[in-house]
Amino acid sequence: MLCLPVFIILLLLASPAAPNPLERRIQSDLIRTALEDADMKTPKGVLSGIMSNLGTVGNMVGGFCCTVYSGCCSEK
């Protein structure tokens, strides 16, 4: 008898809440405006540059990224 209410509560806790469309649109507008204000342009190979600053582990991750997706490689 106690299993059904407990199951329903666990199901409600585990299910993701649906995002509010208005809130999501406002958030994406704010992010877009902030990027335009800062005039941020991502240079090619930015992930590879960040990973190279991390040392040996960064070089391994950067090399793996280049084999999987060439967009994260820096041009040489």
From Swiss-Prot:
Tissue distribution of the protein: Expressed by the venom duct.
Propeptide: 20-44
Pfam families: Conotoxin
A GO CC term attached to the entry: extracellular region
Subcellular location as annotated: Secreted
InterPro entries from the UniProt entry: Conotoxin
Domain-level remarks: The cysteine framework is V (CC-CC).
Similarity annotation: Belongs to the conotoxin T superfamily.
Name used for this protein in its record: Conotoxin TsMLCL-03
Source taxonomy: Eukaryota, Metazoa, Spiralia, Lophotrochozoa, Mollusca
